[in-house]
Amino acid sequence: MTHIRIEKGTGGWGGPLELKATPGKKIVYITAGTRPAIVDKLAQLTGWQAIDGFKEGEPAEAEIGVAVIDCGGTLRCGIYPKRRIPTINIHSTGKSGPLAQYIVEDIYVSGVKEENITVVGDATPQPSSVGRDYDTSKKITEQSDGLLAKVGMGMGSTVAVLFQSGRDTIDTVLKTILPFMAFVSALIGIIMASGLGDWIAHGLAPLASHPLGLVMLALICSFPLLSPFLGPGAVIAQVIGVLIGVQIGLGNIPPHLALPALFAINAQAACDFIPVGLSLAEARQDTVRVGVPSVLVSRFLTGAPTVLIAWFVSGFIYQ
């Protein structure tokens, strides 16, 4: 049987992965933009069918041979490793995100390019783990603990859970939240200092200065073909929000349009998370296939009305 070896690329992490080209398996890819070139190469070498997770939904878990993602360090990095599905990240992202504990080298590899995928011979069998020896010299009554011991063990377990929760929280803040905040701040600073922000602001001012313009902006952001690519990390919404806020401060945009502008630039929020969320909920294949386009269309249909409602409410706030 053909084996496919996948190694990490430049600056990548994890691996190498060795996949058996078992007939009937499928390649699911959840990536923004065009179909990655490594998907075509994997399909050519394995003979597996490639499934677009955004358009066609996720196949049954037993049918997934490998998952290809383009996550920069959020939840998507760990969703498939948590289910022990071989995962290829086209970005050079290591153990990161809320599910970082499930990202291990034997199931995850990142920074992969076409040249990192090769065909090898039969895989070397892994040595079987040695079974655990159990001590059966004691009776069951001798092995049971008393009430005081059980209370102590329960308290110790509770303290351990709370301590681990605090440690995971701090770890997530340091490794995920703070770096992302620094990235967005640096990006906004570069845009503002380079003069690109003024160019974008002048282009947005006609739209953001009138309710109908905000409705048009919401329709653009929530358009089903664009919203999955505008949503990741809410970076675009944050940048546009800063630029619009500056224009409001300068008096170029009326203050009472701040609330509808907030709804307009966030009309695409979470559209990129739909396949991941359905996977977390272990939804059926038919549910994913129908649910993804349904939510995208619903966001498109509800984006403009929410802007109008916000504009109506803002009339009572700013008087």
UniProtKB/Swiss-Prot annotation:
Bilayer disposition of the protein: Multi-pass membrane protein
Listed GO CC annotations: plasma membrane; transmembrane transporter complex
Membrane-crossing segments per the record: 177-197, 200-220, 229-249, 257-277, 297-317
Induction: Regulated by an unusual system which consists of the activator GutM and the repressor GutR in addition to the cAMP-CRP complex.
Location of Phosphocysteine modifications: C71
E.C. number(s) listed in UniProt: 2.7.1.198
This protein's record includes keyword Mitochondrion: no
Sequence ranges on the Periplasmic membrane side: 198-199, 250-256, 318-319
Keyword Nucleotide-binding: no
PROSITE patterns from the UniProt entry: PTS_EIIB_TYPE_5
One GO-annotated biological process of the protein: phosphoenolpyruvate-dependent sugar phosphotransferase system
Domain of life, source organism: Bacteria
Signal peptide (UniProt feature, chain positions): none
InterPro entries: PTS_EIIBC_GUT_C (IPR011638), PTS_EIIBC_GUT_N (IPR011618), PTS_sorb_EIIBC (IPR004702)
Recorded domain comment: The EIIB domain is phosphorylated by phospho-EIIA on a cysteinyl or histidyl residue, depending on the transported sugar. Then, it transfers the phosphoryl group to the sugar substrate concomitantly with the sugar uptake processed by the EIIC domain.
Stated role: The phosphoenolpyruvate-dependent sugar phosphotransferase system (sugar PTS), a major carbohydrate active transport system, catalyzes the phosphorylation of incoming sugar substrates concomitantly with their translocation across the cell membrane. The enzyme II complex composed of SrlA, SrlB and SrlE is involved in glucitol/sorbitol transport. It can also use D-mannitol.
Protein name: PTS system glucitol/sorbitol-specific EIIB component
